[in-house]
Structures are given as structure tokens and as C-alpha cells.
Amino acid sequence: IVSQIFRKIMNEKAKYYIQKLQLEKHPEGGYFREIYRSGEMISIEEPKKNFKRNVSTSIYFLLEGPQISKFHRLKSDELWHFYDGGSVKVYVIDEEGKLTEIILGKKIEEGEVFQTVIKKNNWFAAEVINKRSFALIGCTVSPGFDFSDFELADRKYLLETFPKHKSLISEFTKP
């Protein structure tokens, strides 16, 4: 009974945030809304191209317990900030294949952190640890987010590139 009450409270709180913050479904899983986009632009160079990006962008991002953020990567660094709900485990695979697990949450004495940085070009995914809970976080990207800089992982590519992380990749990618 206690777990049913907890689940109901968490579901209501998640729905409250989705409604009050006007969050929409995110393509990689969860809900989001952009809340800031810098008016200042900077140039970023890529091979044979020169792009302009906002200096910085920020979103609210909410995951409900069973939802996951699938493996993806960005061409900019992204800071994740914990706001409310249950702890979130973030899985990061760097360009050399090293896996790092970071837990965002309120339990500082247990090693959880309020924010973390995911470096550009690293593959990352996330999940709420307690599947009966939710997590509200903020994501700040600099240089600013642009959907053309977002790459949702291809399972086959990740499995070929990082075979030692097969079970995690299979769980956090589309078949």
C-alpha cells in the first residue's frame, strides 16, 4: 500500500510539472521545454563549414520512472542539473569507449551530485533509478543546442564500436 501511495504521489507530481511547465514529448524519451536561448551568436567551425550557434540554451527535461533517455550525443557540452524527484543514473561512453555512471540526485552523502557535465561527442543515456518515481532536471548546452547537432544512436553502430557495453547499449537504443 505504501508503494502504491508513493507511486500515485510521484505520478501526480510529474503530471503537475508537465502541465505547469508546459512540457512536450522529447524525441529521445521523456518531456521537455526550452526555457532559454541566448540572443548572442558565435561561430563554430566544422570541416569545410562555418556555423552560427546561440552562445547557450537551456531546457527543462522530465523523465517518468519507466521512461529512458536513449543513447545520443551532441556536438556541444551539456550540463545536467537535478531539480526534483528521484535519482537519475546517467551513462556516458566517451570516444575511447570508457563507461562512466553518474547519479544525479539529492543524496549528496551517498555520492549523488546536483549537476554533471557531458562532454561533446560522448554518447549518453539516462534513467530514473526508482521506476515508481520521476525526475525533473535542467539541461544547459553551450554552444547552444541545435537539432542538427543531435544524433540519436544507431544500435548497430554502437554495438560494433563499443561491444563490451552490449547489454547497456541494447537496453538504451532502438532495435
What are these regions (language model features)?
Residues K119-N121:
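Extracellular beta-helix/beta-solenoid repeat scaffolds
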Residues T140:
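Histidine-centered acyl-transfer/condensation active-site motif
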Residues I1-I9:
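Short, Lys/Arg-enriched N-terminal segments with co-localized hydrophobic residues
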Residues M10-T116, A125-A126, K131-S133, P143, ...:
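Non-catalytic, conserved peripheral segments adjacent to functional cores
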